[in-house]
């Protein structure tokens, strides 16, 4: 018996050689069905969940734990209770820590802080005498970071690697009746140096705990390898079964589709294959099944069979069965491309952390299904388990629903210097190998897994080479990818860079990131390129995403990538007023933190979607539509089906014809396009074109019937095509109305319509339009003013670490130029009456640091009918950096909380100049609240581009502009750190932009806005026409 004091003295949690003690060898998940039919149907598994309320107490360090807590008779009545699974930091113990790169403790591997929060758990399990006739194994699917286990006061063993199962044989420790389990979990261990992923540091038993009952003679492991013949028609299944039984026992394998057997039973014994010059295995059975023309598994067609593996004694009596879903598919790299079933894949992927806003790292099945359905609804076909093996159920669901998986080992040493320090250290080789091999051994039977990953951001060293070599020997059916060390080392079958650009080199003397187009053309480089991370979706981001997809579709060896990342890692918190907000790094008093750098998702923590997800859905669409030919009476469309393995047998094309953004004709067409092919469709048009009207054809590809992941009617792909107007031009009408009345009263310039219905008043000293009344009702609450500032986006701030601010970041450059702090002076303000209008001209100079930074001239042309034509001329100093925006801001009255905003332009969702591929021109209406995107870290949001007409309240504006509306002042948005810091104002801020800089998004730590979306010109001119909406 190992004494508690000996365990404390031994300090397994600071020894990289002590990865696990007394753990059973890793294997595919086991269920121990006692009947073949039960195995086939997946019912009555011999697994007992130990999830529930456990006794719990947190200590400051292992040395402070009372070793008597391991004993069955220990009095835990005063202890708290905590749910298992859970993270203890989310139940009032200790605090969450978020860091991207930095370790939250002093770096001195393998040692960890002496102040090492230690959670002690206790629970009781009752077993009958009949239960003890079988072996009893306990399985911890995930414990962070390391733990010791006792049963009835006896030490059982130790394990670390928080993302893989730890399984112990409890049989010899159990008694009939009540049994006591005690677990001591350390927050930090030497393994923490290998788990420096960009996520929350949370602790505890956070995945399921299960008791597995198996007979004395049983199946220990099953390794299934599907294959297809050279024509990808017929299938074979290699089955390698490891047993704990006499050599005379037999293994039977049989394949089912539903309840129907599709192969005959195949029965064999150990010693049936010679391995080397010393002979055969005495506990391994090799078998092969063949199936003619099986239904193939792909993400598009996730056809599954079920393999039942049974152990029979020498008399043929059934003892136990295990069963696994089987997907017939073949993964290979040939001709420089990653292929599935002979077809080159295009990876529409995303990196996904296991994150829940209330449960932390605990994921329920419902959460997993919701993520998968959202991914498929938004045209993702692949997921990278960033950066660790996921919950076992995740892979079963990916098999079932259809997602390609890049399964990643729980290894990241991002905070080491150099990053490869541990990766090149032989003392850590065992820890590396254990993490990788146990992942592969657990997950090897899942058809959804098409790529193994050696880990993330750990440099490149001999330990990676060892993992790669083992993988290629153990499972040659799957490629291996790894980004570290430059993305193209000998330890990867796929060039797998992070954040490489399409056309721009990111220079680094150690690990240069070539433009992806160039990378595949480097000398002697024949591998496919799949970005393991790209398009950093932090806040208001994903600019120029369409540029990647144009490259992916143009160059066959550019095979897509995995967006970073899926979900904002915000944790639910409430302020002192009971207002909810999403917390990020530093919000829990965690002094080492990287603030909001964990808020990188395409969706919010509660799974509502960001506008960026619309852009991803559009660019990744599986079915594209393009206009091939147009006459006055018809349009010919080319429909391309990028699905590689299924025809459009459950889709229809709904179309609508728009005139000036309004629908005037609709229709539907049956859609029948074979996989990976094209067809032409003709749409008959029945309308008379109007002079100078704009016409667009919208197409929506919709599901006819519901699928497992989306309801009937779900739109899988959209398109909008501009049509030519076959009508002639309209003759313009000339104004014949008299000019309005101009008067001056001291410093006031007053312009009124002859019927006194419309009135404008300027202050000639400030040059500002102070009042605009219609029928005595104020149209504005504050004067329109030049607007050059935007509340900085995460990409503008450009940091990945709190103490690593880049002076070249946009926000730093803007602050240096004083943008948002300029002092305005009116140079002059003039007015004159013309034949039909009154013109008021004001000139402003903007000063900062003793210099004039900008000069603007506003020319207001006022008509008797209440119309105001505003012409703005902007000149900027040559010394200024690219500007955030060129435009103006007004403040309007707020009459109702759900004020409708109607516009003719791109929408309906938020779009920016470099993120508008998915937006469509039309006449849109949304409420004021819908026009604001509540980014967790408040920033500029809600822009709509390509606008020609806008109505807010009783004011209509026309021109060619971009706009946003909000109840928050820009300074509020710039200063707020969370949404609960924002107090909605009793007014509407209307921002009208002539030009607005792009949002960027190739990454979030460098100025990533592409040149064509930067405002580098020094002269701008624009016009806006204002009029009462009632006209």
Curated annotation (Swiss-Prot):
Under which name does UniProt file this protein?
A: Beta-galactosidase
The gene name on file is lacZ
Residues bound to Mg(2+) 2: 593
> Is Hydrolase one of the keywords UniProt gives this record?
yes
Q: Which family does it belong to?
A: Belongs to the glycosyl hydrolase 2 family.
Q: Where is this site: Transition state stabilizer?
A: 353, 387
Binding site residues for Mg(2+) 1: 412, 414, 457
Q: Which species is this record about?
A: Vibrio vulnificus (strain YJ016)
Which GO cellular component term is one of those annotated? beta-galactosidase complex
- Which residues does substrate bind? 100, 198, 457, 533-536, 600, 1005
Q: Which residues bind Na(+)?
A: 198, 597, 600
**InterPro entries per the UniProt record, alphabetical:** B-gal_small/dom_5, Bact_Beta-galactosidase, Beta-gal/glucu_dom_sf, Gal_mutarotase_sf_dom, Galactose-bd-like_sf, GH-type_carb-bd, Glyco_hydro_2, Glyco_hydro_2_AS
- Quaternary structure (record): Homotetramer.
Which cofactors does the annotated protein need, by name?
Mg(2+); Na(+)
Show the taxonomic lineage: Bacteria, Pseudomonadati, Pseudomonadota, Gammaproteobacteria, Vibrionales
Q: Where is the active site?
A: 457 (proton donor), 533 (nucleophile)
